[in-house]
Amino acid sequence: TDGAGNISWTTASSGALEEITEGSNTGYRIVGRDTANYGDIGVNAVDLSYSLVASTTNGATGRSSTAMGYETKASDNFDTAMGIGTAASGRSSTAMGNNTEATGFTSTAMGENTDATGDVSTAMGTNTDAIGEASTAMGAGTDASGLVSTAMGAGTDASGDFSTAMGSFTVASGEASTAMGESTFATGNFSITMGRYSAAYGDNSAAMGYFTEASGDVSTAMGDSTVASGDVSTAMGEVTEASGDVSTAMGSYTEAPSLAETAIGSFNTPYTPVGVSSWNSGDRLFVIGNGQSSNSKSDAMIVYKDGSTIINGALTLSNGSDSITLPNTDGTSGQVLGTDGAGNISWTTASSGAL
């Protein structure tokens, strides 16, 4: 039209769209494009892409699809492909950026070299893969292969169904597991790990901190280099180990190897229990370690499962206003305990004729 109501035939200018019919489908493509470099236009498709090489797949070939950029492909119904070398082949999928591919139904791939293959999946960033249905992979080199899984950060892997891996090189392979931080592993079902180089191997286990390990089911390891290997065990502090079932090790370099044993303090003495997962009256129930190093291990107090107790050191009993201190050494034959009236009790030789 000349703007005055006069309409006449004219040559379309470069860059304008023209209606074309190919293979019984009618859509729209930029004027002047070499048809040998494109697949047949899709019904109501809009092809704004540019292709220099012969192809039967480039462009907007799906129904109501849109292709933009260089060597892009929108091949299924309602697809959108934008950028360089992107391909949207899943129905209602979107591929944007550089060499991205969206093959899953209503999937989205954005960034560089990303792949969204699962239905309703999303891959964003660089070299990410969203393989599982409804999965999400974001960042650099992340993989989300589990159902409804999420991988975020750098080099993370969420392979368990409903799992989440976040941070740097974390792995969440257990069902509904969560791995966060750097190089952490959550392999147990419903497990969680946080921090650096920590691992939660047991089902329903939790490992937090630095180099911690929770390998027992329903176990918890926290702190620095702690290990909770017994079922329902807890290890906290520094280099503590709870290997008995339902055991607890807290403090520094403490060990709780028997069932329901609790060890606190530092560097308690080691022993071999009879029952790791069963009750034995000769095993320890509670121990307070007061050792100073791995070469100087000792115990301030030991309570055994039969109730017998060993106290290494003086024992002071107090009612708040008065107190007495019992000696921690044995007397000689014939000696008795005596008091000086000030709360100090010691071994003394009984006077002649005393009862």
Where are these regions (language model features)?
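Extracellular repetitive beta-rich solenoid segments
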Residues: 1-14, 279-309, 313-353
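Periodic small-residue-enriched repeat registers in elongated scaffold domains
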Residues: 15-312
